[in-house]
Amino acid sequence: MGINLSNGDWNRYKKEGFLITKFGDLIDYIMNWARSGSLWPMTFGLACCAVEMMHTASSRYDLDRYGIIFRASPRQADVMIVAGTLTNKMAAALRKVYDQMADPKYVVSMGSCANGGGYYHYSYSVVRGCDRIVPVDVYVPGCPPTAEALLYGMLCLQNKIKRTKNI
């Protein structure tokens, strides 16, 4: 004999930190907790936003304490940070690098230029947002966005991963 909970009750108890007893939910919780605590981003710096991205790795913000360690190879990374103006010629390279990443893969669009073309929106050679080339999970606004904004975006990505339901 047991207690039957509706979906709403089950989700409420799970959010409040009660022990999860369904085996599938337990496995999902553990996998998502591990994934969110060890993000390995690869930088795809194209303009001035890449300089601000370097600040987040410095001692003041220290992304390492959140388990975020930058990688140089797309085969080792699970997050790609697109920072700066994406031109039409670089779009194919962006897609190729994205395809080389292992699943599950996430994309963070950093800055106004990567989000929607920014200052160069009406230029013939600029892609109006990297979401036209790769699927984007988190948008970080600003021109250029501050290191705090990127840090907040990475924390939002961690929360999104924790909420993900695995199949």
UniProtKB/Swiss-Prot annotation:
SUPFAM superfamilies, alphabetized: HydA/Nqo6-like
Subunit comment: NDH-1 is composed of 14 different subunits. Subunits NuoB, C, D, E, F, and G constitute the peripheral sector of the complex.
Similarity comment text for this entry: Belongs to the complex I 20 kDa subunit family.
Pfam family membership, one: Oxidored_q6
Identification of the protein by name: NADH-quinone oxidoreductase subunit B
Cofactor stoichiometry and binding remark: Binds 1 [4Fe-4S] cluster.
Binding site for [4Fe-4S] cluster: 48-49, 113, 143
EC top class named in words: translocase
